[in-house]
Amino acid sequence: MLFRCNILALVGGGRNPRYPPNKVMVWDDHQNRCIGELSFRSEVKAVRMSRERVVVVLEYKIYVYNFADLNLLHTIETASNPRGLCSLCPDSRACVLACPGLQKGHVKVELFDITRTTIVPAHESSLGHLSTNLDGTRLATASERGTLVRVWDTKSGQRLHELR
């Protein structure tokens, strides 16, 4: 659901799915109709939305679309991402996307507002979770082991804190 509005992203799944698991339906609940469709060759693992972007996560790729017209803006290659890990900053002034990098335990931080990419060598083992703060300046990561949470600066990639 996009903030507190009537726009939803739906992906098929479960026992009797209405839609296939490789399709994203952008649904306007106020109009009670589909306002956009995105189809892929593989299963959709996650969808993130902001006022400007729709981000679709597949196991090895992430697609970033313009929200207004669903035009493709970026394609990002990732390492295997079966959990659909991805964080999109909701602040419209800072378009920040964090996702798994190409190497195990690394995070790729895309700073779209200043067209810069930062690679963060977050953990030695595979990522278990990642999340940005509301204004996109910080990134928190945990590995699959779950023994450490690390906090990073998104612009510099510098580690700020480590919590056990």
Language-model region placement:
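Acidic, low-complexity cytosolic segments
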Residues: 29, 36-38, 43-44
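Per-blade loop-tip surfaces of WD-repeat and WD-like beta-propellers in eukaryotic adaptors/scaffolds
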Residues: 25-33, 64-79, 102-127, 144-161
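Residue-level detector of Asp-centered blade-edge/turn motifs that repeat once per structural unit
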Residues: 2-4, 49-51, 91-93, 134-135
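Beta-propeller domains
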Residues: 1, 7, 11-30
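Short, solvent-exposed loop/turn segments at conserved positions within beta-propeller repeat blades
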Residues: 16-21, 56, 100-105, 144-145
